[in-house]
Amino acid sequence: NRNKHLNKNAQMHDPNPRLIVVKGIGLFATGKNFNEAKIAMDVGTNALSVMIDAFSYNKFKSISEKEIFCMEYWPLELAKLKKTNLSLQGNVTVISGGLGAIGYKTALKFLNEGSEVILLDNIKYNKNIKGMSYFECDVTIESEINKVLKKISEKYGGIDIIISNAGFAIQRSLEDIDKLILDKSFAINFFAHHYLTQQSVEILKRQSTGGSILFNISKQAVNPGVNFASYGLPKATLLFLMKQYALEFGKYGIRFNGINADRIKSGLMTKKIISKRAKARGLSINDYMSGNLLKKEVKPED
């Protein structure tokens, strides 16, 4: 405001610093997203290099505050920097099962709304995922989750949104379920969600900035189908888990919610599974996939 008279129509920029020097520790950069912070760090380190070079000859002297203001609020500079703020800008979102149909389509939605997006999945994937990061992680193993969340926190400064999406469908009737099948289903469809949430909550509590955790549960949790108990049992338990987390950690400003998705073609709901589920309900595949009030098939991007 000291220089407002130089450009009375100028709207003040975000006053938060982009570079922070902590004596004895180092230089830190901030931004609305990871890329902005990286650019700020590049500018900062280059500026330091110029200063050091200047001191090797004589001394470094910065331009005046008035000159800085005129440069920062130059109309052409303002036009270059003008951007639309997106609804999730500044957020860091972690999605488990991120390479699956639902996980990846969800990731694209969050990316388009300005969030930093990190995908977790249990397969080796070396291809570049434009605009997103990928970490190989088996979310049924607590130690792997711990390592990955530490890496994400170190790189991005924390997390804000967790979408616990990983899942696995097994069709069995109650009389055909053996211990191995039930253990496998509970491992991915219940315990994996609990492990990821439990460790994420600890990070969100330390950050003291709230947060949001969303579970991909299933219609099976509230409206079970025949011969699908091996999948429905852990999903029904997951619905309870979501409510319990909300009761215990809502006081920290952390929100918990769940989506009860139904009949969506994905790596979980394969053609084979869909065919079996349609047969179990005595329906054609088309009628089964459009079995809702709108009579339309629901797709991952929906």
State where each predicted segment sits:
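Conserved Rossmann-fold SDR core element
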Residues: G158, F249-S266
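The catalytic Tyr-X3-Lys active-site helix of short-chain dehydrogenase/reductase
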Residues: L111, A192, P224, A229-T237
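Residue(s) in the substrate-gating loop at a strand-loop-helix junction
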Residues: S218
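Active-site helix of classical SDR
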Residues: T197, P234, M242
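Active-site loop immediately N-terminal to the catalytic Tyr-X3-Lys motif
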Residues: E175, N223-A229, K251, K295
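Catalytic Tyr-X3-Lys loop
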Residues: F168, E175-Y195, L214, L238
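Alpha-helical segment proximal to the catalytic Tyr-Lys
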Residues: E202, L247-E248
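Conserved glycine-rich cofactor-binding loop
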Residues: L99-G100
